[in-house]
Each structure stands twice: as C-alpha cells, then as structure tokens.
C-alpha cells in the first residue's frame, strides 16, 4: 500500500491513500497535525527534524508560513531546540564548491522579456569541475527572483547525464505550477519544478513560451 502525504496542489493522487493539503507550507507541518491527532509525543529530536523540514520548505519562513508555523516554532524553542542553528546549517553555511558553482550560474544569468525573467543553468561538467556535492545548487533560483523587476526566475541543474531539473519561482502573479505542469512536473503557485530533457537553450525556449502566456 502506498500512502502519500503532500502539500503540493498539483499532486495527481498517485497513492492508495492520499493526504494532500495544499494550504500547508510544508509536509512537516502536515505531520505535526497528524502526530497531535494520533497523540504521538513530539520529542526534542522529532521537533528538530520537523523544524528542519519547515525551515527548508519555507526558505526560512519567507514563503507560505502560517500562524501555526510560528506557533510550532515557539513550541520547538521551548523544547530547547536551537532554531537559529538549523537555519544556519540548512540555509546559510556554504562550502567553497557551493560558492564556485553559484558563481558559474550567476555569470551565465540572462534577463529576458524586458527584465521580467531571469534564466540561468549549471552543467554536469560544472559540478565535476568544482567538486560539487548534492544540494550545492540550492538557492540559485531564489537569487534570480530577488533581482529588481524580475517576476519569474528559471534555473536548470543536471540530473546526472539524463536531463535537467527545471526550478521555477515567481514573485507576485505568475503561476509557475501551471508552467511546471506543462513540462510534466508540478508544485506551488510560486515555486515549482519538473524534470526535462534537451539542451539548456531548448528548455529555456519551452519554458519562455509558457511564461509569456502569463506575463503582464
């Protein structure tokens, strides 16, 4: 039996039992409710794991955090969990390979559609050259979105030699979940992704065709 717990509204209900809550900012926040329902005690270790999931999914409480999110964070602090340490370890601490990989992506960044779209990518060769570890690309797509006047940030990173993961972020009005769905993926209105094949240029053009349908 396959049980699916998810907070993505684009979930296709592929499990035998599906618990989908697209309002929840993180799967870990769904688990908190389940633990309470089944009267499972949330220990300090469990709270640390749940808080790690919430911090990474909300990018440090920046996206979709609710009052319940902050109430749980307060309870975690009362248990003695060092939330600032989780934040530093997951979102702030960088190694040299991470820095070099990000630098390559920023050097390639293009601003398209009158500056409303930021696009960049890294290659498998880039990862090998700098000695990157899994996850060293995290955060690149957010930087593109944070540039003034950018509405949509598009970032590609390799999935071995099979293709690319396209990550999409939007600032205000573009629904990137719909764009990801058109590419075979899914996600949230302002954060989504998909696995795609082709060259970075080919993938860029496919994504731009969908983005243009929503740009104002």
Predicted regions and their residues:
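Hydrophobic helix-and-loop "lid/oligomerization" segment in the mid-to-C-terminal part
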Residues: 56-182, 187-216
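Short, small-residue-rich loop/turn micro-motifs
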Residues: 6-7, 187
């Amino acid at each position: 039996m396959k049980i699916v717990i998810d907070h993505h509204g684009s979930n296709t209900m592929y499990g035998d039992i599906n618990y989908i809550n697209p309002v929840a900012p993180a799967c870990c926040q769904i688990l908190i409710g389940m633990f309470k329902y089944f009267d499972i005690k949330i220990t300090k270790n469990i709270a640390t794991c749940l808080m790690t999931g919430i911090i990474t999914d909300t990018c440090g409480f920046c996206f979709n955090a609710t009052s319940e999110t902050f109430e749980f964070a307060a309870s975690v602090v009362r248990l003695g969990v060092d939330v600032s340490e989780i934040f530093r370890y997951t979102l702030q601490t960088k190694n040299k390979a991470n820095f070099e990989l990000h630098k390559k992506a920023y050097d390639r960044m293009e601003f398209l559609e009158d500056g409303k779209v930021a696009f960049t990518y890294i290659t498998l060769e880039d990862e090998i050259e700098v000695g990157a570890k899994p996850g060293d690309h995290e955060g690149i797509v957010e930087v593109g979105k944070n540039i003034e006047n950018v509405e949509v940030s598009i970032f590609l990173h390799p999935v071995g030699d099979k293709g690319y993961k396209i990550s999409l972020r939007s600032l205000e009005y573009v629904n990137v979940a719909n764009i990801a769905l058109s590419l075979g993926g899914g996600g949230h209105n302002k954060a989504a992704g998909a696995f795609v094949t082709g060259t970075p240029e080919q993938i860029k053009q496919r994504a731009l065709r969908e983005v243009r349908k929503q740009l104002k």
